[in-house]
Amino acid sequence: NNRIEINKINSDMISLEKQISDVAEGLKDVVTKSELADMMNSFVSDDDEKWLMFNAKFSSADEVYETIYKQAKSSIYVVDNYIGLRTLVHLKNSPTGVAIILFSDNVGNNKLHNIEFTDFCKEYPTVNLSMKKTGGIFHDRFIVLDYGTADERVFLCGASSKDAGARITSIVEDYGVSKYAPVIATLLKNPTLILPQ
């Protein structure tokens, strides 16, 4: 009986060691107080650089969006009701041949206008970009790469890409991609977004 109990305790200790090892590994990506203080100070500095938190790391906002978009293999879907020229500029280096759909109702001040969109398309003719309405039901913003494929990825975005880094915000990858399928399927049926002149 003692031998069985000793074996069970031994097994429990091995399991506990594994859990502690996993926690220690996860702590490598945790932001320290000093890193967070540096980030907060950058939001109130006169520096032009825009910063955000990306998967618990302090990063340049523009670089984060461009890095995410460059990973796409077949499609990029951006859901963001507050769009502007900066939203488009983040997409300029997307891989050639990737279909990009921007889902938006284009609300708020500083809306994207047709002239800006037309000029962008002329300057970056290899960017395959179209727009659809969101239908007034979205608050959150997110990016979906390679929808409906084995490579599908979803990123939740705290702020609109046109304002990213202006205030404290973050982008995180959500690994539960299947829950977004009905949302994206609905969005794909929405009408084309017509931009104001």
Question: What would you call each of these model-derived segments?
Answer:
Residues I68-K73:
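Secondary-structure "cap/kink" motif recognition
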Residues N1-D62, I83-Q197:
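PLD/PLD-like phosphodiesterase catalytic module centered on the HKD motif
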Residues I76:
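Catalytic histidine site
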